[in-house]
């Protein structure tokens, strides 16, 4: 079990949670910061910034029947990001963590050539002083070191839904020390970062 009664669990949706018959009711299951699917908040002296990437296909793709408008959502978040990075709460934080579903940084066969989040937010996030970015989407664990693809911070991408590729990330902060540990389904450590 996750133990959400004792340990904070923060939910951020991915593209699959937007597509199914239950997606419309998903909002009723979670409290959203500022009633938006993206936002920022402090957890102790750590600033958590969560972004909503929307879908991984253009709004005009036939599967959406003209019902999606994630382009405007991403544009709104670009404005939010500029304000957030300039905010007192962000600047005062001892650590800053970025969380979003689709990786903005990273290259190779696992990364989509269509990446509107990188187009919209990449220039804003390139120099941002985050300790780490936590992502998913590719269904394969990856570690992108700081500076490998224009990223100013390490990027950790979680694994997939199958047991042979599944991962769990444990972000922990004690005092001034922050660590991120990535485990596979066997409980083996794939990566441990001192942030």
Which residues does each PLM region occupy?
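Extended active-site neighborhood of metal-dependent phosphoesterases/phosphodiesterases
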Residues: 1-86, 120-126, 132, 140-174
